[in-house]
């Protein structure tokens, strides 16, 4: 057996975070246990867990402090409430049948325990570490999380200490608000009026990017830190370089023109994926996007079927979305140009995943009100709107 578990519990300086391994004495966990007990490290001295002095639990459990212990006051928090809490959690896990009683002499546990140097309340240190250890053991032996849970939660989660959310496009449809006005003050004011929604994307349009460069992304981030921001460069050359520029500027997606050479599009997509951002292929003036897609080594993340501002007065269609999805089944389809409120049901009915709207929102007298109308037309609830966040 070689199982791994993790759990975080509590709040404030007494918050507990436990990483642990549980496995056979003769396996890698047993080897790690023996190494830890015999190869001491200054400030991270391993110690056996004990319910009280002279009463260790079974399976035998080794505690390793994560934070460097610098004085006896900090040591007392480990050699006391944390040591006892971990031991009691192991013993109770046996009593409750989580750890099989007939295997306690064959198994060992190695637990890495976090104690903040500023933690003061011994009662909370004990209770939080008890709960975190017990939960980590249960998760380890149940194989939690399984891969389906990981994939389900990975795009929802925000690391509490990181302090911001990295938004991904996994729950379409979305409204993409395109800011083509090169007046930065106007753009930032309008962005501040866009409702916070899981289904809104912010686009730094081509004129805005041309005037201020990709550094405008950081200005937008100051107004909307968690937004998914698309940089509409309409790249025609040096695809890998421009993708890297957008990634370095903390953008979430870069737009490449479908008129660019195939090698440029390929390099841009490869670099975008390497740096963790989305690659968007804009089909403006490309009359045969399917032919382009068939020549690519890797599909873009988003394919934008685009009618330009200069020709919006004419009748149009957004192309054969069904055929495109057959070639690029994992790609999201965006439609741009002439997307007005009455066209939303039509676009969604044709299979669009992203509706790109510019002046209909950004030039409105009441930006917030019009944006809310488009968001409501998506008929999509907020992600986890009614979820009480406890275990995740």
Curated annotation (Swiss-Prot):
Disulfide bonds: none annotated. Keywords: Carbohydrate metabolism, Lyase, Multifunctional enzyme. Pfam families: Fae, OMPdecase. GO terms for molecular function: 3-dehydro-L-gulonate-6-phosphate decarboxylase activity; carbon-nitrogen lyase activity; hexulose-6-phosphate synthase activity; hydro-lyase activity; orotidine-5'-phosphate decarboxylase activity. The keyword Acetylation does not apply. Its EC number is 4.2.1.147, 4.1.2.43. PANTHER family: 3-KETO-L-GULONATE-6-PHOSPHATE DECARBOXYLASE SGBH-RELATED (PTHR35039:SF3). In the N-terminal section; belongs to the formaldehyde-activating enzyme family. In the C-terminal section; belongs to the HPS/KGPDC family. HPS subfamily. Catalyzes the condensation of formaldehyde with tetrahydromethanopterin (H(4)MPT) to 5,10-methylenetetrahydromethanopterin. Catalyzes the reversible formation of ribulose-5-phosphate and formaldehyde from 3-hexulose-6-phosphate. This is Bifunctional enzyme Fae/Hps.
């Amino acid at each position: 057996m070689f199982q791994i578990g993790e759990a975080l519990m509590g709040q404030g300086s007494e918050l507990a975070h436990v990483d642990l391994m549980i496995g056979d004495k003769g396996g890698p966990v047993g080897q790690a246990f023996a190494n830890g007990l015999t190869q001491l490290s200054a400030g991270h001295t391993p110690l056996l867990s004990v319910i009280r002095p002279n009463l260790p639990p079974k399976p035998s459990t080794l505690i390793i402090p994560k934070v460097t212990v610098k004085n006896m006051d900090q040591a007392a928090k480990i050699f006391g409430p944390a040591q006892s809490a971990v031991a009691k959690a192991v013993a109770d896990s046996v009593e409750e049948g989580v750890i099989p009683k007939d295997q306690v002499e064959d198994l060992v546990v190695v637990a890495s325990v976090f104690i903040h140097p500023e933690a003061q309340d011994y009662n909370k240190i004990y209770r939080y570490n008890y709960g975190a250890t017990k939960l980590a053991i249960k998760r380890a032996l149940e194989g939690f999380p399984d891969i389906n849970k990981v994939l389900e939660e990975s795009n929802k989660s925000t690391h509490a200490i990181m302090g911001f959310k990295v938004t991904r496009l996994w729950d379409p449809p979305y409204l993409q608000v395109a800011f083509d006005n090169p007046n930065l003050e106007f753009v930032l004011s309008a962005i501040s009026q866009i409702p916070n929604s899981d289904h809104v994307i912010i686009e730094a349009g081509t004129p805005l990017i041309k005037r201020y460069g990709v550094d405008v992304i950081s200005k937008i981030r100051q107004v909307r830190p968690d937004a998914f921001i698309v940089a509409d460069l309409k790249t025609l050359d040096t695809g890998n370089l421009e993708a890297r520029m957008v990634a370095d500027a903390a953008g979430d997606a870069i737009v490449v023109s479908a008129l660019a050479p195939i090698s440029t599009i390929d390099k841009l997509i490869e670099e975008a994926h390497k740096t963790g951002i989305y690659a968007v292929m804009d089909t403006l003036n490309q009359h045969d996007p399917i032919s382009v897609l068939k020549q690519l080594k890797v599909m873009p993340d988003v394919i934008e079927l685009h009618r330009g501002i200069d020709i919006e007065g004419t009748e149009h269609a957004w192309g054969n979305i069904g055929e495109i999805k057959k070639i690029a089944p994992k790609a999201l389809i965006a439609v741009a140009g002439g997307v007005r409120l009455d066209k939303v049901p039509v676009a969604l009915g044709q299979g669009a995943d992203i509706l790109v709207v510019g002046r209909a929102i950004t030039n409105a007298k009441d930006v917030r009100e019009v944006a809310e109308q488009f968001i409501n037309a998506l008929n999509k609830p907020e992600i986890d709107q009614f979820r009480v966040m406890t275990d995740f």
